[in-house]
Design a protein with these regions (language model features):
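Short acidic/His/Gly/Ser-rich catalytic and metal-binding motifs that mark active-site loops
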Residues: 63, 124-127, 205-209
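Metal-dependent catalytic neighborhoods of phosphoester/phosphodiester hydrolases
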Residues: 69-72, 98-106, 255-256
Length: 274
């Protein structure tokens, strides 16, 4: 597995739900992090029996000059877009899916890839009723952009998967809804070992891994997100899984260590081959 940086985004205090700025400052300062948070955006590349697999595809041109770096880093890893066989989406928010298409032509950037996503996730973003019920910003940035990115793959290059389904050899969808209705993590099994790519289980690990009850202002169902985060963190810790996170600081690999009533991420040692 290779970590690929899509860059980072600067966020404000308002990304947190019911969490005060001074609390953010205090928790970020413990790890010598800037506050308000700077959030890494990562994607992950797998090469193995299932072919060349990309997990999430970054933000394209949607998030400004500090993000959208996936393609130059994919090239640095020696992979051309047309060589990618499968793209696994954790969910359809812009920083995870807006690298699917060419921003000028609207065509697929991964000409030979099949996109695999949770059925619930795709059905939500293609629900006209849900779109009409959303505010104007969400209609554009979430529903509109999700459809813009996924549409070119609906001609036979989109596969809808279910919770618990082994979508490729050794890769299983583990649903962890709340952040979005079909937010998914990907459980990887190889040679008797497991690791999990946890998507947006934690946007700011310094806070949400230590305090799993803290949700984000843009969570679809904040309470569900907090419950599922709490449960999945406990499972990861109990099973001592290596984790890969889209918003763990690059390269994004780590282990959970118990700290008080929560956890912290112990960053995996740097390794050119993981």
């Amino acid at each position: 597995m290779t970590a690929l940086s899509d860059g980072y985004v600067e966020m404000g205090y308002n990304i947190f739900r019911e969490f005060e700025p001074h609390e953010v400052d205090e928790m970020m300062a413990r790890d010598h992090r800037v506050s308000p948070p700077r959030i890494s955006v990562n994607c992950f590349l797998l090469r193995g029996p299932a072919g060349t697999v990309l997990i999430d595809c970054g933000s394209g041109e949607k998030f400004g000059p500090t993000a959208g770096k996936l393609f130059e880093n994919l090239e640095a890893a020696g992979v051309r877009p047309e060589e990618v066989d499968h793209i696994l989406l954790t969910h359809c928010h812009p920083d995870h899916s807006c690298g699917l298409t060419n921003p000028v032509t609207g065509e697929r950037l991964f000409a030979n890839a099949t996109v695999i996503a949770n059925r619930k996730e795709i059905e939500h973003w293609y629900s006209d009723a849900e779109m009409q019920a959303a505010d104007e910003r969400k209609r554009l940035r979430y529903f509109g952009w999700a459809r813009e990115q996924v549409d070119p793959y609906r001609d036979g290059r989109l596969r809808l998967a279910e919770d618990g389904e082994e979508v490729l050899p050794g890769i299983t969808l583990v649903e962890c809804a709340g952040h979005t209705p079909g937010h998914s993590t990907w459980l990887l099994n190889s040679e008797g070992k497991q690791m999990i790519v946890w998507g947006d289980l934690a946007h700011v690990p310094e806070i949400q891994v230590a305090r799993p009850e803290v949700s984000m202002s843009f969570d679809h169902d904040p309470d569900m997100a907090a419950r599922n985060r709490t449960n999945l963190l406990a499972r990861i810790f109990k099973q001592d899984m290596l984790v890969a996170g889209m918003h763990i600081h690059f390269p994004g690999f780590g282990w959970l260590v118990r700290e008080g009533t929560g956890y912290r991420v112990a960053i995996e040692q740097w390794n050119f081959e993981i």
